[in-house]
Amino acid sequence: MAEQLTEEQIAEFKEAFSLFDKDGDGCITTKELGTVMRSLGQNPTEAELQDMISEVDADQNGTIDFPEFLNLMARKMKDTDSEEELKEAFKVFDKDQNGYISAADVRHVMTNLGEKLTDEEVDEMIREADMDGDGQVNYEEFVRMMLAK
């Protein structure tokens, strides 16, 4: 499954994995998964977290290691983002729910994920997705960017 990923995708997933893996031990626990999900505005129960982990926990040790994480991500990408998932993701970034993602919105979410970005990096992210040049990202631009992987 993970064989279909590009080197760039694997590098991105490695970075995401290390955001989840707070103690750097090479495994994601339910506690670490819960922390990240809550920072994204989700509120999963302990049972839901265990379900998510056991879904991809090939060696049944109760945690997700990087190869298991890659398989999960490859599977998720194959399921191509449903309309509902895209709407949810957009809502996470659109903090003030005005229908646009601003640089401040991106900065806020990335900071909650523990990712410190420079103003230039945030502006670059907005520029890449901003088709009409208004300095922010609307839902259509967001969908186009997410499906352009």
Curated annotation (Swiss-Prot):
InterPro entries registered for this protein in UniProt: CALM/Myosin/TropC-like, EF-hand-dom_pair, EF_Hand_1_Ca_BS, EF_hand_dom
Molecular function per GO: calcium ion binding
Residues binding Ca(2+) 1: 21, 23, 25, 27, 32
Binding site for Ca(2+) 2: 57, 59, 61, 63, 68
Recorded superkingdom: Eukaryota
Residues annotated as domain EF-hand: 8-43, 44-79, 81-116, 117-149
Binding site for Ca(2+) 4: 130, 132, 134, 136, 141
Gene3D superfamilies according to UniProt: EF-hand (1.10.238.10)
GO cellular component labels: myosin II complex
N6,N6,N6-trimethyllysine found at: 116
Keyword Metal-binding set for record: yes
Pfam families documented for this protein: EF-hand_7
Positions contributing to Ca(2+) 3 binding: 94, 96, 98, 100, 105
Positions bearing N-acetylalanine: 2
Record keywords: Acetylation, Calcium, Metal-binding, Methylation, Repeat
Miscellaneous comment in the UniProt entry for this protein: This protein has four functional calcium-binding sites.
Function field: Calmodulin mediates the control of a large number of enzymes, ion channels and other proteins by Ca(2+). Among the enzymes to be stimulated by the calmodulin-Ca(2+) complex are a number of protein kinases and phosphatases.
Similarity annotation: Belongs to the calmodulin family.
UniProt xrefs under PANTHER family: CALMODULIN LIKE 3 (PTHR23048:SF0), MYOSIN LIGHT CHAIN 1, 3 (PTHR23048)
Protein name in UniProt: Calmodulin-2
